[in-house]
Design a protein with these regions (language model features):
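Alpha/beta-hydrolase-fold serine-hydrolase catalytic core, especially in secreted/extracellular enzymes
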Residues: 1-175
Length: 175
């Protein structure tokens, strides 16, 4: 669930980029569509948010104080799903001189206190024959048996459009 980011500013290239080095670099990584651990920062691109990521479909975001970014960290171990949600703010302290791209930033985080999302789960992530606990920001929001339902397969398909991310069970979470 972790990504290695590699950004190179190439003078004189603008958006005319030689993508030939990208494919061999990407090939050295393995896609994990249903990770047991991830850290994801949800933010708008050109004013639009993604509907979801990994196994989470976000319905409402915590935009307290004009905040646009939320960091989600998930760990699954022994049928316990632990999630931490934080509002994230950046303060740029150094910019690249030619294009003004932020190069060094200070980060501050606060626990998210609002929001609503669907957490999708599959049998390769948790054991459906045993109780599952979901803990969000230290608070237990679910403790019980998951009930597989074709409805969750359909809604996860509609959200992610990814055959590797079809989930038979879901937990609705409201902070």
């Amino acid at each position: 669930g972790e990504y290695c980011h590699n950004i190179q500013l190439i003078p004189g290239r603008g958006h005319h980029i030689d993508y030939n080095p990208t494919t061999p670099w990407l090939k050295s990584f393995v896609r994990t569509p249903r990770p047991l651990h991830f850290v994801w920062e949800d933010f708008p691109m050109d004013g639009r948010y993604r509907n979801g990521f990994y196994n989470i479909h976000v319905h409402e975001r915590d935009t307290t104080g004009g905040n646009e970014r939320t960091r989600y960290e998930m760990d699954i171990r022994d049928n316990v799903v632990s999630l931490s949600l934080e509002r994230v703010k950046y303060m740029t302290v150094e910019r690249e001189p030619k294009w003004g791209i932020p190069m060094v930033q200070h980060t501050s985080c606060e626990r998210a206190t609002k929001g609503r999302f669907t957490l999708y789960l599959s049998p390769d992530m948790v054991d459906f024959d045993c109780k599952v606990s979901v803990i969000v920001n230290g608070r237990r929001v679910f403790n019980g048996y998951l009930k597989p339902d074709v409805r969750h397969l359909a809604t996860s398909c509609a959200c992610f459009f990814d055959p590797e991310r079809l989930f038979p069970a879901a937990v609705e979470v409201a902070l």
